[in-house]
């Protein structure tokens, strides 16, 4: 019989101080909550075997599968601006890597027991955070945003102690890699240039193979990470996503969204929104995310200085030149995304101001971010040059002062006259850019309460069904598109560790 996971491991071949070898800790009574069968097929795995007793034991950490080389990776990181020289995987164990139809992917268990980096923690995960990450990562994937994926969620039959006793669970996470900005900081902080070089060479081979042919491969690696992060954060903003804990150890060089602990989506639009209970000063607020991304990338550039050039002045020049490119790349991606949300297929000098004026009006009028843009797509002028009055009223109703929307919409409709194409095509473009469904924060809490307190996973399954098709109307699930009463003000998220 073939192996359950056809592992082809590369990170485990790196020097031993890159990680600590550790096996998952067995649990009492593993039970499968959900297997992502479609993802399993994409990875070249047999979903039926993964759902078998043997498969569930592997997904729970009860059994180490053939070919696995379980390890916990070492890394450092800036956490809320403060540098911590050693963090590492404290509750996650990399089983190995598989090569599927989309390339090489890590298979990692989260909540599978203590590791050398657990720092007195139990290495376990509670059910609520596991279900949250499963849902959010799959919702982000359906939205078309680069992200880690969830292969499976398993309950352990054990309790974990946080503020109270909670049911334990294990998440199987899939990622292009788990190399973080903090991975490079770990070696740079120790003055380990050879370790830094080995990690960079591994990253180039895995994520930027064309960089190996560049005049300066390490500068090309840095350029690639910057380009991916600029595009990623722009995509976050266009769907109202707030990561919540953008520490350097939570930034993947693969350009995937990773570590979903205290994340959330905007309800009412306010760029100062920060949901995380530990982000007391709004460092990682919605509108700060581009600035923080650049700050994190600057820390990566600092770590790479010894590789960029043997001459310190030249190395700094290379780093600064690379970082200078972030702003333009982010702005192009962000404003391109906003244009699509407004139904604009071409670019004009005044477009950023047009979008900015709408966002300002939304903030002043406490309009819902997702519903405003979705309904705007139905309010485009028809063949006769006039919008549907009912569609216009549906947008206006989201604003405290509907006439503020009216004033903005006059300029928008004038701008649309510069565009080719008919109203139907424009409406279709806007529907593809403006989701009807995001993972509403109050629905997350309802789902977690049902699962944790009543062992009822029906709300979890329903949300998975709805969020798999975020750009479709789905009339039977219309209530899941609605914001909470009060626009979500006062909502708080917790990292779950």
From Swiss-Prot:
Please state the Enzyme Commission number of this protein: 2.7.7.-, 2.7.7.108
What reaction does this enzyme carry out catalytically?
A: L-seryl-[protein] + ATP = 3-O-(5'-adenylyl)-L-seryl-[protein] + diphosphate; L-threonyl-[protein] + ATP = 3-O-(5'-adenylyl)-L-threonyl-[protein] + diphosphate; L-tyrosyl-[protein] + ATP = O-(5'-adenylyl)-L-tyrosyl-[protein] + diphosphate; L-histidyl-[protein] + UTP = N(tele)-(5'-uridylyl)-L-histidyl-[protein] + diphosphate
Cofactor(s) the protein needs: Mg(2+); Mn(2+)
Q: Which domain of life is it from?
A: Bacteria
InterPro entries for this protein: Kinase-like_dom_sf (IPR011009), SelO (IPR003846)
| GO MF annotation list | AMPylase activity; ATP binding; magnesium ion binding
Q: Which residues of this protein are catalytic?
A: 249
SUPFAM superfamilies the UniProt entry points to? Protein kinase-like (PK-like) (SSF56112)
Name the residues that bind Mg(2+): 250, 259
Keyword Nucleotide-binding included in the entry's annotation: yes
Question: Among its keywords, does the record have ATP-binding?
Answer: yes
Q: Which family does it belong to?
A: Belongs to the SELO family.
Summarize the protein's role: Nucleotidyltransferase involved in the post-translational modification of proteins. It can catalyze the addition of adenosine monophosphate (AMP) or uridine monophosphate (UMP) to a protein, resulting in modifications known as AMPylation and UMPylation.
Name-wise, this protein is Protein nucleotidyltransferase YdiU
Q: State the species of origin.
A: Methylorubrum extorquens (strain PA1)
Q: Taxonomy-wise, where does this protein's organism fall, top ranks first?
A: Bacteria, Pseudomonadati, Pseudomonadota, Alphaproteobacteria, Hyphomicrobiales
- Which gene is the coding source of this polypeptide chain? ydiU
